[in-house]
Amino acid sequence: MKVVILNDEGHQEVMVEDQVKLDEIKEKNKDKWFFISDTGQKVAMNEVSLEHGIRELQIIEPLIGG
């Protein structure tokens, strides 16, 4: 699975091959949203799993205010 992290510094791509690496990313980004880029669907951090067969995830910085 490719994980794309979008933030103030631009974007960073990380290849995630196992659940341990995915869990690290989830822990670091637990206050953010994931988007499944294939579908544009927004998912909560705790719903993301390698078992879903997702090809690419984008991590989006949370919007402040509203």
What is each of the regions a protein language model found here?
Residues M1-I64:
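Ubiquitin-like/PB1-type beta-grasp interaction modules and other compact soluble beta-rich domains
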